[in-house]
Swiss-Prot record:
Cell location: Cytoplasm
NCBIfam families: PRK00094.1-1 (NF000939), PRK00094.1-2 (NF000940), PRK00094.1-4 (NF000942)
Binding site for NADPH: S15, Y16, H36, K110, A143, R259, V283, E285
EC top class named in words: oxidoreductase
The protein's name: Glycerol-3-phosphate dehydrogenase [NAD(P)+]
Species classification: Bacteria, Pseudomonadati, Pseudomonadota, Gammaproteobacteria, Enterobacterales
GO biological process: carbohydrate metabolic process; glycerol-3-phosphate biosynthetic process; glycerol-3-phosphate catabolic process; glycerophospholipid biosynthetic process
GO MF term list: glycerol-3-phosphate dehydrogenase [NAD(P)+] activity; NAD binding
Gene Ontology CC annotation, any one: cytosol
The gene coding this protein: gpsA
Length: 339
């Protein structure tokens, strides 16, 4: 592989970052995958697969592993960041002085900035400046299915039309991976954060034993909360009927591959928050996202009762069943109400 002519450098060698790197390489592109732990990267190189997360998917020959950040960033102008949302800003500040002058950045991170609840576009602008083209990809994607080449579709939004076109061409594969462009940069980002929260609620509902009717009602009203918050932030409401909204919401709320859903199920069954997190064994993005989405909703004066009750369970010690009964006991109202 040419050391400075890769199609994409992927920052983050977890399950999703690895799956996206494999997908790009399988599309015939030269790809560099960087991980922060040199020992982990050495293991990936030795095994030519991610044994911990994707043991049955060998790396294509065009996928190169790299533990030196400067070398990885010099390899391509296109940088795909796939790290947890709570370290997103830190990672961008780390890569800023090492990026090429012509660099363009896209992220697959879902969530908001820890503590502040800011959109990741604002974090990126603060860290990288106003000139670099930015993009985000989001949608219903479990890493194992994506890496296995099973049919998957996502949304792509960018601040730069040329970058959006280039990314769509790089990622799109007619056999298995559809990439839909969407001009709504805010909406595509927001959907991925809110769905994590609602997925915890769906898991709680199933853990309590409420059944399919309750789960479906929660998903539907969760979509209403997502759309309500999006409208307050200036997003296009139709975005939330697409891959980054409804698509990701349904997937995460209904399939046990979702860590957020499994986490919620444990809470619904009576397990405490810390024990449930420990049992999952990986980052549960929805735990932090709940606090961040609630903060954002308060800032913009948006009522989000499901999010509020999930927050009460996660951070205030409220019982999951009690939270569900609080929601069921709310006053009657028009389904189309903004409250």
């Amino acid at each position: 592989m040419n050391q400075s002519n890769a199609s994409m450098t992927v920052i983050g060698a977890g399950s999703y970052g690895t799956a996206l790197a494999i997908t790009l390489a399988r599309n015939g592109h030269q790809v560099v995958l960087w991980g922060h732990d040199p020992k982990h990267v050495a293991t990936l190189e030795r095994d030519r697969c991610n044994v911990a997360f994707l043991p049955d998917v060998p790396f294509p020959d065009t996928l190169r592993l790299e533990s030196d950040l400067a070398t990885a960033l010099a390899a391509s102008r296109n940088i795909l960041v796939v790290v947890p949302s709570h370290v997103f800003g830190e990672v961008l500040r780390q890569i800023k002085p090492l990026m090429r002058p012509d660099a363009r950045l896209v992220w697959a991170t879902k969530g908001l900035e820890a503590e502040t609840g800011r959109l990741l576009q604002d974090v990126a602008r603060e860290a990288l400046g106003d000139d670099i083209p930015l993009a985000v990809i989001s949608g219903p994607t479990f890493a194992k299915e994506l890496a296995a080449g099973l049919p998957t579709a996502i949304s792509l939004a960018s601040t730069d039309e040329t970058f959006a076109d280039d990314l769509q061409e790089l990622l799109h594969c007619g056999k298995s991976f559809r990439v839909y462009s969407n001009p709504d940069f805010i909406g595509v980002q927001l959907g991925g954060a809110v769905k994590n929260v609602i997925a915890i609620g769906a898991g709680m509902s199933d853990g309590i034993g409420f059944g399919a009717n309750a789960r479906t009602a929660l998903i539907t009203r969760g979509l209403t909360e997502m759309s309500r918050l999006g409208a307050a932030l200036g997003a296009d409401p139709t975005t939330f009927m697409g891959m980054a909204g409804l698509g990701d919401l349904v997937l995460t709320c209904t399939d046990n591959q979702s860590r957020n859903r499994r986490f919620g199920m444990m809470l619904g069954q009576g397990m405490d928050v810390q024990s449930a997190q420990d049992k999952i064994g990986q980052v549960v993005e929805g735990y932090r996202n709940t606090k961040e989405v609630r903060e954002l909703a308060h800032r913009f004066g948006v009522e989000m009762p499901i999010t509020e009750e999930i927050y009460q369970v996660l951070y205030c010690g409220k019982n999951a069943r009690e939270a569900a009964l609080t929601l069921l006991g709310r006053a009657r109202k028009d389904e189309r109400s903004r409250h």
